Amino acid sequence: MRIPRWPVLGAVVLVAMVASGVALGVGPWPGLAPSVAASSGDVRYTAARAHGSTTVKAIRAGSVIASATFAGAYGIPAVTSAGKAGGLSPDGRLLVLAEPPSYKGLRSESRFLLVSTGALSLVDTIVLKGEFGFDAVSPDRRTLYLIQHVSRTDLVTYVVRAYDLRAKRLLARVIVDKREPGETMRGYPVARATSARGVWVYTLYTRSPDGGRPFVHALNAVARAAFCIDLPRWPNRDIWDARLELASDGRQLVVRSGATAVARIDTASLTVVR
């Protein structure tokens, strides 16, 4: 995947997105989601901030079944511009809370809370130097994937990082497509789909407003590996309504814009087949 380089200020990019009707937080992140549901769908978690603390609730069938309050302001991280919620491990046992997005550019420090959903108890607090946002959690709950932004003048340039939850440290190696290790990653997340067991996390990115081709970032959350798949061009005005659909057998990922299948990706070869 060849990425065109353009020196547009991140703020200009975000203003353009807002003007197009896209819902997102100010800064390099999509913002926070109101709640996130377990894969089973029977329990939903919310995070409300007030007076310097955050109250997390587990809700089933409209009733609060558990509640806990933690110091600091945190929320359910969104992972796409449409506000799709993230934060839960695939097995639903770990909830990652993130700080609200910054309104003043890149932060010098990022914090995350790790909460056990069994008793809504605090597992750990992660503090990292720099601007980091939530991306995904591996199925074995060993790895927390983060998106790191390092440019103050180009907020859509990013790198994927891995945090070892057992060793409690950020790994030095950046998660890149080994087929093109020197590429620069840039774009904004539009849609996401995850395989049944959470091994593969697929995210559709746009390169708006430079007109570059959109791409799917395929993360193997177990192997700590990533692959980028270039897609055919289609009008930027339509990409914000795009969605990813994973076949029930996991063998094909369909990129749709409205009723149109823009691309079909073979998940074994990670190539566009039609």
Q: What spans do the regions from the language model cover?
A:
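Bacterial N-terminal signal peptides
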Residues: 10-21
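A short beta-strand motif characteristic of beta-propeller blades
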Residues: 26-29, 64-77, 121-127, 169-183, ...
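Repeated scaffold domains used in trafficking and secretory/extracellular systems
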Residues: 29-39, 75-87, 130-138, 180-193, ...
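Short coil/turn segments that connect the beta-strands within blades of beta-propeller domains
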Residues: 41-42, 91-93, 140-142, 197-199, ...
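Residue position within the beta-strands of beta-propeller blades
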Residues: 46, 97, 146-147, 202-203, ...
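Short glycine/acidic-enriched loop and turn motifs that connect beta-strands
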Residues: 49-53, 100-105, 149-154, 207-211, ...
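Short loop/turn segments that connect beta-strands within beta-propeller blades
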Residues: 60-63, 116-120, 164-168, 220-224, ...
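Beta-propeller blade signature
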Residues: 109-117, 158-165, 214-221
